[in-house]
Protein backbone atom coordinates (compact mmCIF):
# COMPACT_ATOMS: atom_id res chain seq x y z
CA UNK A 1 0.00 0.00 0.00
CA UNK A 2 2.83 2.42 0.84
CA UNK A 3 4.44 1.83 -2.58
CA UNK A 4 1.12 2.46 -4.33
CA UNK A 5 0.60 5.73 -2.46
CA UNK A 6 4.17 6.83 -3.25
CA UNK A 7 3.66 6.04 -6.94
CA UNK A 8 0.39 7.96 -7.00
CA UNK A 9 1.98 10.98 -5.31
CA UNK A 10 4.86 10.94 -7.81
CA UNK A 11 2.41 10.79 -10.72
CA UNK A 12 0.02 13.48 -9.49
CA UNK A 13 2.57 15.83 -7.92
CA UNK A 14 -0.13 17.28 -5.63
CA UNK A 15 -0.05 20.77 -4.15
CA UNK A 16 -0.51 19.14 -0.74
CA UNK A 17 -0.92 15.70 0.77
CA UNK A 18 -3.77 15.32 3.27
CA UNK A 19 -3.45 12.44 5.73
CA UNK A 20 -6.96 11.71 6.98
CA UNK A 21 -6.39 10.26 10.48
CA UNK A 22 -3.42 8.75 12.25
CA UNK A 23 -4.17 5.33 10.80
CA UNK A 24 -2.80 6.29 7.36
CA UNK A 25 0.58 7.44 8.69
CA UNK A 26 2.32 4.10 7.89
CA UNK A 27 1.59 4.50 4.15
CA UNK A 28 2.53 8.16 3.76
CA UNK A 29 5.13 8.72 1.03
CA UNK A 30 8.19 10.91 1.56
CA UNK A 31 6.64 14.36 1.49
CA UNK A 32 7.76 16.56 -1.38
CA UNK A 33 4.48 18.46 -1.03
CA UNK A 34 3.24 20.12 2.18
CA UNK A 35 1.66 17.63 4.57
CA UNK A 36 -1.72 18.35 6.15
CA UNK A 37 -2.71 16.05 9.01
CA UNK A 38 -6.47 15.79 9.53
CA UNK A 39 -6.66 14.13 12.94
CA UNK A 40 -10.07 12.83 14.00
CA UNK A 41 -8.44 11.69 17.24
CA UNK A 42 -5.02 11.73 18.80
CA UNK A 43 -5.09 7.94 18.65
CA UNK A 44 -2.18 7.41 21.02
CA UNK A 45 -4.10 9.19 23.75
CA UNK A 46 -7.22 7.14 23.03
CA UNK A 47 -5.26 3.89 23.34
CA UNK A 48 -3.66 5.09 26.57
CA UNK A 49 -6.99 5.85 28.24
CA UNK A 50 -8.19 3.16 30.68
CA UNK A 51 -11.21 1.15 29.63
CA UNK A 52 -14.62 1.28 31.24
CA UNK A 53 -13.89 -2.15 32.69
CA UNK A 54 -10.57 -3.49 33.88
CA UNK A 55 -8.89 -5.34 31.04
CA UNK A 56 -6.69 -8.44 31.42
CA UNK A 57 -3.02 -7.72 32.12
CA UNK A 58 -1.85 -8.87 28.69
CA UNK A 59 -4.34 -6.57 26.98
CA UNK A 60 -3.35 -3.63 29.18
CA UNK A 61 0.32 -4.17 28.35
CA UNK A 62 -0.44 -4.48 24.65
CA UNK A 63 -2.42 -1.24 24.67
CA UNK A 64 0.33 0.52 26.65
CA UNK A 65 2.98 -0.30 24.06
CA UNK A 66 0.60 0.39 21.16
CA UNK A 67 -0.18 3.79 22.68
CA UNK A 68 3.52 4.64 22.95
CA UNK A 69 4.17 3.57 19.36
CA UNK A 70 1.20 5.51 17.97
CA UNK A 71 2.02 8.62 20.01
CA UNK A 72 5.60 8.51 18.74
CA UNK A 73 4.41 8.28 15.13
CA UNK A 74 1.93 11.11 15.65
CA UNK A 75 4.61 13.32 17.22
CA UNK A 76 7.02 12.72 14.33
CA UNK A 77 4.45 13.47 11.67
CA UNK A 78 3.14 16.52 13.51
CA UNK A 79 6.69 17.81 13.55
CA UNK A 80 6.91 17.37 9.79
CA UNK A 81 3.45 18.73 8.96
CA UNK A 82 2.74 22.09 7.42
CA UNK A 83 -0.64 22.07 9.16
CA UNK A 84 -2.59 19.92 11.60
CA UNK A 85 -6.39 20.00 11.63
CA UNK A 86 -8.04 18.70 14.80
CA UNK A 87 -11.73 18.24 15.55
CA UNK A 88 -11.67 19.96 18.94
CA UNK A 89 -9.65 22.46 20.92
CA UNK A 90 -8.92 19.62 23.36
CA UNK A 91 -7.18 17.65 20.61
CA UNK A 92 -5.45 20.80 19.35
CA UNK A 93 -3.92 21.27 22.79
CA UNK A 94 -2.78 17.64 22.77
CA UNK A 95 -1.23 18.07 19.30
CA UNK A 96 0.68 21.15 20.42
CA UNK A 97 1.96 19.22 23.44
CA UNK A 98 3.38 16.57 21.10
CA UNK A 99 4.84 19.08 18.62
CA UNK A 100 4.99 22.60 20.09
CA UNK A 101 6.00 24.17 16.78
CA UNK A 102 3.20 22.77 14.65
CA UNK A 103 0.59 25.06 13.14
CA UNK A 104 -2.73 23.61 14.29
CA UNK A 105 -6.33 24.68 13.74
CA UNK A 106 -9.64 23.29 14.98
CA UNK A 107 -12.40 22.34 12.54
CA UNK A 108 -15.19 20.54 14.40
CA UNK A 109 -17.24 17.58 13.25
CA UNK A 110 -20.52 18.87 11.82
CA UNK A 111 -23.93 17.61 10.69
CA UNK A 112 -26.32 18.28 7.82
CA UNK A 113 -29.05 20.34 9.48
CA UNK A 114 -31.26 20.07 6.39
CA UNK A 115 -31.54 16.35 7.12
CA UNK A 116 -31.83 16.79 10.88
CA UNK A 117 -34.83 19.05 11.51
CA UNK A 118 -35.89 20.11 14.98
CA UNK A 119 -38.37 17.48 16.17
CA UNK A 120 -41.42 18.19 18.33
CA UNK A 121 -40.81 17.20 21.96
CA UNK A 122 -41.78 13.77 23.19
CA UNK A 123 -44.53 14.44 25.76
CA UNK A 124 -43.25 13.97 29.30
CA UNK A 125 -46.48 12.15 30.11
CA UNK A 126 -46.18 9.63 27.26
CA UNK A 127 -45.62 5.98 28.11
CA UNK A 128 -43.16 4.41 28.12
CA UNK A 129 -40.48 6.88 29.10
CA UNK A 130 -37.68 6.11 26.69
CA UNK A 131 -33.96 6.90 26.81
CA UNK A 132 -31.93 6.48 23.64
CA UNK A 133 -28.38 5.38 22.95
CA UNK A 134 -27.15 5.98 19.39
CA UNK A 135 -23.67 5.02 18.25
CA UNK A 136 -21.62 2.57 16.21
CA UNK A 137 -21.78 -0.57 18.32
CA UNK A 138 -18.68 -2.04 16.65
CA UNK A 139 -16.65 0.78 18.25
CA UNK A 140 -15.52 -0.64 21.64
CA UNK A 141 -16.16 2.52 23.73
CA UNK A 142 -19.76 2.53 22.52
CA UNK A 143 -20.33 -1.14 23.30
CA UNK A 144 -18.81 -0.68 26.75
CA UNK A 145 -21.21 2.22 27.30
CA UNK A 146 -24.17 0.08 26.23
CA UNK A 147 -23.10 -2.66 28.63
CA UNK A 148 -22.95 -0.15 31.47
CA UNK A 149 -26.30 1.33 30.51
CA UNK A 150 -28.07 -2.02 30.49
CA UNK A 151 -26.42 -3.67 33.49
CA UNK A 152 -25.91 -0.73 35.86
CA UNK A 153 -28.08 2.22 34.92
CA UNK A 154 -31.24 0.63 33.58
CA UNK A 155 -32.25 -1.10 36.86
CA UNK A 156 -31.93 2.22 38.73
CA UNK A 157 -33.76 4.16 36.03
CA UNK A 158 -36.60 1.63 35.95
CA UNK A 159 -36.89 1.73 39.73
CA UNK A 160 -37.27 5.51 39.53
CA UNK A 161 -39.50 5.44 36.43
CA UNK A 162 -41.46 2.16 36.25
CA UNK A 163 -41.81 0.94 32.69
CA UNK A 164 -38.89 3.00 31.35
CA UNK A 165 -37.13 1.49 28.34
CA UNK A 166 -33.70 2.01 26.80
CA UNK A 167 -33.51 1.89 23.01
CA UNK A 168 -30.18 0.88 21.42
CA UNK A 169 -29.57 2.12 17.88
CA UNK A 170 -26.45 1.97 15.74
CA UNK A 171 -24.44 0.01 13.19
CA UNK A 172 -23.86 -3.46 14.58
CA UNK A 173 -22.18 -5.49 11.85
CA UNK A 174 -20.84 -8.01 14.37
CA UNK A 175 -24.24 -8.52 16.01
CA UNK A 176 -22.97 -7.65 19.48
CA UNK A 177 -26.32 -6.24 20.57
CA UNK A 178 -27.88 -9.70 20.34
CA UNK A 179 -26.77 -10.41 23.90
CA UNK A 180 -29.27 -7.79 25.12
CA UNK A 181 -32.29 -9.11 23.24
CA UNK A 182 -34.94 -10.22 25.68
CA UNK A 183 -33.57 -8.13 28.54
CA UNK A 184 -36.41 -6.42 30.36
CA UNK A 185 -36.65 -2.76 29.45
CA UNK A 186 -34.27 -3.00 26.47
CA UNK A 187 -35.27 -2.27 22.89
CA UNK A 188 -32.57 -3.61 20.58
CA UNK A 189 -32.80 -1.91 17.19
CA UNK A 190 -29.26 -2.00 15.78
CA UNK A 191 -28.52 -0.79 12.26
CA UNK A 192 -31.02 1.66 10.73
CA UNK A 193 -31.20 3.78 7.59
CA UNK A 194 -32.78 6.72 9.40
CA UNK A 195 -32.26 7.62 13.05
CA UNK A 196 -34.93 10.32 13.17
CA UNK A 197 -37.88 8.04 14.06
CA UNK A 198 -35.93 6.77 17.07
CA UNK A 199 -35.09 10.26 18.30
CA UNK A 200 -38.74 11.20 17.78
CA UNK A 201 -39.96 8.72 20.41
CA UNK A 202 -37.13 9.36 22.90
CA UNK A 203 -37.42 11.61 25.94
CA UNK A 204 -33.65 11.94 26.30
CA UNK A 205 -30.35 10.70 24.91
CA UNK A 206 -28.42 8.81 27.59
CA UNK A 207 -24.67 8.28 27.14
CA UNK A 208 -22.62 6.58 29.90
CA UNK A 209 -19.42 6.76 27.83
CA UNK A 210 -16.11 6.27 29.69
CA UNK A 211 -13.51 5.88 26.94
CA UNK A 212 -12.71 6.92 23.38
CA UNK A 213 -11.97 10.35 22.01
CA UNK A 214 -12.63 12.85 19.26
CA UNK A 215 -15.99 14.59 18.96
CA UNK A 216 -19.20 12.78 19.83
CA UNK A 217 -21.28 13.17 16.70
CA UNK A 218 -24.18 11.53 18.48
CA UNK A 219 -24.45 14.53 20.84
CA UNK A 220 -24.38 17.03 17.98
CA UNK A 221 -27.07 14.96 16.25
CA UNK A 222 -29.23 15.03 19.39
CA UNK A 223 -28.80 18.80 19.70
CA UNK A 224 -29.81 19.27 16.08
CA UNK A 225 -32.92 17.12 16.44
CA UNK A 226 -33.95 18.70 19.73
CA UNK A 227 -33.42 15.96 22.27
CA UNK A 228 -32.04 16.56 25.78
CA UNK A 229 -28.59 15.05 26.29
CA UNK A 230 -27.61 13.28 29.52
CA UNK A 231 -23.96 12.23 29.43
CA UNK A 232 -20.77 11.60 31.34
CA UNK A 233 -18.05 14.22 31.32
CA UNK A 234 -15.93 12.10 28.97
CA UNK A 235 -18.82 11.78 26.52
CA UNK A 236 -19.04 15.56 26.10
CA UNK A 237 -15.44 16.56 26.80
CA UNK A 238 -14.49 17.76 23.31
CA UNK A 239 -17.62 19.78 22.60
CA UNK A 240 -18.35 23.48 22.95
CA UNK A 241 -21.50 22.80 24.97
CA UNK A 242 -21.68 23.99 28.57
CA UNK A 243 -22.66 21.53 31.28
CA UNK A 244 -26.05 22.44 32.69
CA UNK A 245 -26.94 24.62 29.71
CA UNK A 246 -26.50 22.37 26.67
CA UNK A 247 -26.28 18.98 28.39
CA UNK A 248 -26.66 17.45 31.86
CA UNK A 249 -23.93 15.42 33.46
CA UNK A 250 -24.12 12.16 35.37
CA UNK A 251 -21.41 9.74 36.47
CA UNK A 252 -23.48 7.23 38.46
CA UNK A 253 -26.86 5.56 37.89
CA UNK A 254 -28.42 7.54 40.75
CA UNK A 255 -27.18 10.80 39.24
CA UNK A 256 -28.56 9.70 35.88
CA UNK A 257 -31.98 9.08 37.38
CA UNK A 258 -31.94 12.48 39.08
CA UNK A 259 -30.94 14.30 35.90
CA UNK A 260 -33.65 12.50 33.95
CA UNK A 261 -36.18 13.54 36.59
CA UNK A 262 -35.11 17.17 36.14
CA UNK A 263 -35.46 16.89 32.37
CA UNK A 264 -38.90 15.30 32.55
CA UNK A 265 -39.96 17.85 35.15
CA UNK A 266 -39.52 20.77 32.77
CA UNK A 267 -35.79 21.08 32.22
CA UNK A 268 -35.89 19.72 28.68
CA UNK A 269 -37.08 22.89 26.94
CA UNK A 270 -34.04 25.03 27.75
CA UNK A 271 -31.60 22.19 26.95
CA UNK A 272 -33.29 21.71 23.58
CA UNK A 273 -33.29 25.42 22.76
CA UNK A 274 -29.64 25.89 23.68
CA UNK A 275 -28.51 22.67 21.99
CA UNK A 276 -30.20 23.44 18.69
CA UNK A 277 -28.82 26.99 18.72
CA UNK A 278 -25.29 25.67 19.29
CA UNK A 279 -25.66 23.14 16.46
CA UNK A 280 -26.76 25.92 14.10
CA UNK A 281 -23.95 28.23 15.17
CA UNK A 282 -20.97 25.86 15.27
CA UNK A 283 -21.82 22.35 14.08
CA UNK A 284 -23.41 22.65 10.62
CA UNK A 285 -21.62 21.55 7.47
CA UNK A 286 -21.10 24.97 5.82
CA UNK A 287 -19.12 26.12 8.86
CA UNK A 288 -16.72 23.17 8.59
CA UNK A 289 -16.48 23.27 4.78
CA UNK A 290 -15.45 26.92 4.82
CA UNK A 291 -12.90 26.33 7.58
CA UNK A 292 -11.40 23.28 5.84
CA UNK A 293 -11.17 25.14 2.53
CA UNK A 294 -9.41 28.08 4.15
CA UNK A 295 -7.02 25.81 6.05
CA UNK A 296 -5.93 23.84 2.98
CA UNK A 297 -5.68 26.96 0.82
CA UNK A 298 -3.36 28.50 3.39
CA UNK A 299 -0.96 25.63 2.73
CA UNK A 300 -1.29 25.44 -1.05
CA UNK A 301 -1.27 29.18 -1.81
CA UNK A 302 1.37 29.99 -4.39
CA UNK A 303 2.05 26.37 -5.37
Task: Explain the meaning of each model-derived region.
Residues 1-25, 58-80:
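Conserved nucleotide-sugar donor-binding subdomain of glycosyltransferases
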Residues 37-72, 136:
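Acceptor-binding helix/loop patch of EC 2.4 sugar-transfer enzymes
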Residues 44, 63-118:
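Donor nucleotide-sugar binding/catalytic pocket of nucleotide-sugar-dependent glycosyltransferases
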Residues 82, 185, 200-214, 225-227:
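Acidic donor-binding loop of glycosyltransferase active sites
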Residues 110-119, 123-182, 188-201:
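Conserved catalytic-core segment of nucleotide-activated headgroup transferases in glycan assembly
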Residues 218-222, 228-232:
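Short hydrophobic beta-strand element within catalytic cores of glycosyltransferases
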Residues 245-254, 262-267:
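Conserved acidic donor-binding segment of nucleotide-sugar-dependent glycosyltransferases
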Residues 269-297:
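A charged, aromatic-enriched C-terminal amphipathic alpha-helix characteristic of glycosyltransferases
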